[in-house]
């Protein structure tokens, strides 16, 4: 199955972007070539940019506190697996503690490190990190891969709590919904939301339907899923086939 996700608000959109960037950082940091570690470092800059646009730390703490209260209330329910519930609450409490221990905003990493600031200012220029522009960075790229990796991990350490909080919130959100089989008749599907508020929509497609691309949109009244198909380099075009898929609407 291939999964497409659509956030209903800017807060969830930001968390999804951070999740994607952290995954990219992991991948390129696990490689060995200097160019791959260059991508890891520029990805770290992107994470700092996204995380610095809003007070994510406060938002995450508030959401985790809200989830802890809701889950704690379930301890009186004998039908709930108390061991699993305690594990989830423990994870949430650990995330809150880690976030409370962090000092400053994500962008503080750049303002405190002039060398990283100089690399970032050149990295946004096409071809701006050549050896004649940043000889010190060029020399760093020729250090052993283990040293480069250790440096990037050190620079990313202030973001560990933010990543843990983001991961926990998104996991709880994704687990909050139930999937249902629907069909996009003539390539299009729409559903009234009947006043219910959602934060995330998921579309699960069978691998055999990989050629069909869902374009999703929603407002507080209705959601739409319109399937398109792309031929070569041409723009995606609408399709009129009946396409089955799994739809999941998630909300805390």
From Swiss-Prot:
Subcellular location: Cytoplasm
InterPro entries recorded: ZapD, ZapD_C, ZapD_sf
GO cellular component, as recorded: cell division site; cytoplasm
UniProt-listed GO biological process terms: division septum assembly; FtsZ-dependent cytokinesis
Keywords for this protein: Cell cycle, Cell division, Cytoplasm, Septation
Taxonomic superkingdom: Bacteria
Function: Cell division factor that enhances FtsZ-ring assembly. Directly interacts with FtsZ and promotes bundling of FtsZ protofilaments, with a reduction in FtsZ GTPase activity.
Description of how the protein assembles with itself and partners: Interacts with FtsZ.
UniProt record similarity statement: Belongs to the ZapD family.
Protein name according to UniProt: Cell division protein ZapD
Gene name, Swiss-Prot/TrEMBL: zapD
């Amino acid at each position: 199955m291939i999964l497409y996700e659509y956030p209903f608000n800017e807060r969830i959109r930001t968390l999804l972007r951070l999740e994607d960037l952290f995954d990219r950082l992991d991948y390129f940091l696990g490689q060995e070539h200097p160019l791959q570690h260059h991508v890891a470092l520029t990805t770290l800059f992107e994470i700092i940019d996204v995380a610095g646009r809003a007070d994510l730390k406060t938002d995450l703490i508030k959401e985790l506190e809200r989830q802890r209260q809701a889950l704690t209330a379930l301890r009186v329910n004998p039908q709930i697996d108390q061991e699993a519930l305690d594990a989830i609450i423990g994870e949430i409490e650990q995330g809150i503690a880690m976030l409370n221990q962090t000092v400053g905003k994500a962008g503080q990493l750049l303002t405190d490190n002039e060398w990283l600031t100089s690399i970032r200012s050149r990295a946004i220029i096409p071809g701006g990190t050549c050896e004649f522009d940043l000889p010190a960075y060029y020399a760093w790229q020729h250090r052993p891969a283990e040293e480069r990796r250790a440096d990037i991990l050190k620079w990313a350490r202030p973001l560990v709590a933010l990543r843990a909080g983001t991961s926990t919130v998104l996991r709880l959100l994704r687990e909050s919904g139930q999937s249902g089989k629907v069909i996009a008749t003539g390539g299009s599907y729409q559903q009234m939301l009947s006043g219910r508020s959602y934060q995330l929509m998921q579309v699960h497609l069978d691998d055999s339907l990989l050629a069909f691309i869902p374009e999703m949109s929603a407002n507080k009244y209705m959601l739409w899923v319109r399937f398109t198909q792309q031929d070569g380099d041409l723009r995606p075009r609408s399709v009129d086939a009946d396409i089955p898929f799994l739809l999941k609407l998630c909300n805390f």
